[in-house]
Structure formats: structure tokens, C-alpha cells
Amino acid sequence: MKTLVVLCTLLSIIFASPLSLKSPLVDDFYNPPRGYESAKLGEILKLRKTPGKISSLFIPVEVKNSWQLLVRSEDSFGNAAAIVTTVIEPFNADPSKVVSYQSWEDAANIECSPSYGMQFGAPLSSVQTQVDMIFIVPLLDKGCFVVLPDYEGPKSTFGVGRQSGKATLDSIKAVLKTKDFSGINDDAQVAMWGYSGGTIAAGWAATLQPKYAQELKKNLIGAALGGFVINITATAEATDGTLFAGLIPNALNGLANEFPDFKKRMYEVVEKRYEGALQQGTQHCLGGAILHFAFDQVFTGDHRYFEQGYGLLEEEVFNRTISGNSLLYMGQEYLPDIPIFVYHGSLDGIVPIPDVHGVYKNWCDWGIDSFEFAEDSLNGYLTEIVVGAPAAITWLDARFDGQPVVEGCKKTTRITDFSYPNISDSTRNFFKGILDSLTASQLGPGVTSDNVTLSGLTGFMGGLSKFKKSV
């Protein structure tokens, strides 16, 4: 009976007309007030409850509160900027625990911002944020406040490291000033977590923090980075002409949104017949880009967008911009001052692991205090998203519990990251989180929910599949 209720509810949601949410393009909340430039970094410029309910897989989830903050930040050049960050409070939240989750937005379009895409009623184009919300549910179920910054900022600068890192740090500064309405302690422990494109933000935040946000040293307890993106060129080479070729035009346009000289040169040298195709990289969120650009050859083949191919990346403006936003090429002054946990699949065909080995060697040679590297020999990019998540959650739990971190550097290669030590509870909570999101259960420690069983859910999914085939 429970399964039938869930099935009927889900079907009504799937086939109902989407709720009306204002796009960031027309929502005045995203526009900073006059004179905001004089505000301090991390200062809250505007505050509101999220217009729509938080949702996962386009199904509302029950949390106690959620807010959006407009926060003073800056771009790569130090120019004033205002970014939106979302704060989610679960039931029975622990005001001393905050996780800053950097979603894998991977788009050069502000309508792909997490603050918009995580709400019930968001368009189907926001599917990547809705899927990413699955990984946030277990954190909420553990009582952590979760913060999701629109780290690409108002210009949608996908791939731009400093913009993303600064926005992440400024959003954390802002959240630690919300005690009056959120209850979050100003001395709360804060951890960062991101996968793939989210590691551009979390990774750069970790490297910028010692100089850009020294005051956060007492709060930050570590960063978990999965599918660690540290070399934009390597990802372009790995994905050109593949199913994930859409990452390339999205990233090129994200860089162009921040660097005018890069944009000017890029559109000067693109083959005229492909100029419109390249511009489409500003129109699609990640899911749409994968579909639209599937198997396109941007740098290779007879129908490549750029006649020079990869040789174009050696031009001064291209080389300077791309290498300047790749952590692989950053010097010792970018060494993180907080514990780092990296989990990565050996078979990753989108974010190749050799460059991650390079960053591991560099940071360890330079004397990083704590760097734990979990390499999964059985999994690649897509499967490690799920397989590595319980390891990340386990590592985050240990940080919040005050357990000792790795001293210096430690790299372990396992057949699967499911065998990461002490992962059993985390695995159960992770998959329970997925179940809770599907059944719209109240989230928070100690909350009793009327959930369907796992076998019931399996049957429900099978029934849904048959239903869709019959209509």
C-alpha cells in the first residue's frame, strides 16, 4: 500500500505542470543593492527563504528551513561581485556542523545555478543539480547544515578557479554570521565537499584560504575532493569526440565569461561554420550540453571547431588562461593549510588520474600537513561518483568527530572505495538518504519516517518502468 501511494505521488509530480519559479535572469534577488561594493567580503547583502521547497530528483524533501543569501564576493581580478548561496537546515540540526557542498554545475549559464536548480519546480534542464542533491541528503540526515554556493558567480564562470574558490570561502564567511536566524554557531566546524566540477571550487578554496580567508582557519576542518579536476586541458583531451564532449564548449565559454581577451581570441579563430555551435555552450546546463554536443569534435577530426586543433592551446592567451586556472600548474604558495581527502577512480576517462598523482606529489613534496589519497582501481568517473561518496562521508564524519587525520601523506589503492575503513554506517546512511529523498521523508537525526522498504522501492521502480513503456 505504501509503495502504491509513493508511486501515485511520484507519477503526479512527473506529469504535473512545473511550478513557477523566477529565473535568476529576472529575479531581482540576484541583483546586488546600490553601493554594495563598499561591503566587506562575506557580508550578507540580502536574505530570504528559498522561494520553492528543496527537492531531490524533482521530488520535494522535508527540511526544517532553507534560506538564500546574497553575499559580497569578488571575481578573479578583485572586482566586486555578489553571489547567491543557499543554507539548508535539517530537523534536529547540530549548530556546530556545517558542510559546504560545491555542486558540479559545469555550465556557463546562470539558469544552471544550484540556488535555482535545487528547488521544486525548477526546469528539467537543472537535472544535474537534482541528481547532485542525492549526495546532500545523507549530510542533512546526520544533522549537518548544508551550504551550497553559486560559486560560478553572476557571470557563470565555469572552470575559473579563483572566482569559484573565493565565492566558496565568502559564502562560508557569510553563513557563520547567520546565528540570529539559522542558529549556526559562529565557531562551527566547516568541511568542504565536491565532486568533478565541484572540486574546482572546493580545491581552489582550499588553496586560496591561507591568504584570502585567514579568519576561516579556526573553522575549516578539511576538504573532500572526488574526481579532482586540476588540469582543464587533460579533461578536454579526454572528452573531445566522446559522449561528454559538451564539457568543452561549456568550459570554454565559462572561461570566456571571465576573461575578455580569451573570449575575443576564441571567437576570432573558431571556424565560422561552427561559431553558432560554440555559442551554444552558453545556453545549456550540463545535461543539455551532453545531449547537444555528444561526440562533437572540438579540437580533433575533420569537422573540428578549431582548425589549429590542440595547437591552439599553445597560443599565449589560451595557454595563460587555461594553465592559470589549473591547480596542477600552481606553485607552493597555493599549498592548502587544511586536511585534504581525494578519492578518484583509476579508470576515470573524463578527469584522468595521472595529473592527480602529480598534484599529490607536489603537495607532499612541499610539506602539506595532511593529504589522504584513496585511489579506486575498479571504477571510473561515473561509478566513482556513487562508490566514492560513502568514503567521503566517512572521512567527513571522522573530521567532525575529532578523530586524528593522516599525518603528512598517505595514498592507498583499493579494488573499490566501498572497502574504505569504517564505511558500513556511512554506506547505509548514504543509500538510506537516496530512499528518503524518494519518499519525501523528514530529514534529520532522530526523526522517524514512514518509509517504504527497499524491496518495495525496487518493485516500485520496476512498476514505473513498465508504466512508462505502456504510455
From Swiss-Prot:
UniProt GO cellular component terms: extracellular region
Signal peptide: 1-16
Active site: 196 (charge relay system), 348 (charge relay system)
Known catalytic reactions: a triacylglycerol + H2O = a diacylglycerol + a fatty acid + H(+)
Glycosites: 231, 319, 422, 451
One Gene Ontology term of the molecular function aspect: triacylglycerol lipase activity
SUPFAM superfamilies: alpha/beta-Hydrolases
Disulfide pairings: 112-285, 364-409
Signal keyword on record: yes
GO BP annotations, alphabetical order: lipid catabolic process
Keyword tags: Disulfide bond, Glycoprotein, Hydrolase, Lipid degradation, Lipid metabolism, Secreted, Signal, Virulence
Record's keyword annotation contains S-adenosyl-L-methionine: no
Intracellular or extracellular location(s): Secreted
This enzyme's EC code(s): 3.1.1.3
Family recorded in the similarity comment: Belongs to the AB hydrolase superfamily. Lipase family. Class Lip subfamily.
Known function: Lipase that is able to hydrolyze both the neutral triacylglycerols and the monopalmitate ester Tween 40, allowing the use of hydrolyzed products as carbon sources. Has broad lipolytic activity, which may be important for colonization and subsequent infection, therefore contributing to the persistence and virulence in human tissue.
Protein name: Lipase 3
Origin species: Candida albicans (strain SC5314 / ATCC MYA-2876) (Yeast)
Record lineage: Eukaryota, Fungi, Dikarya, Ascomycota, Saccharomycotina
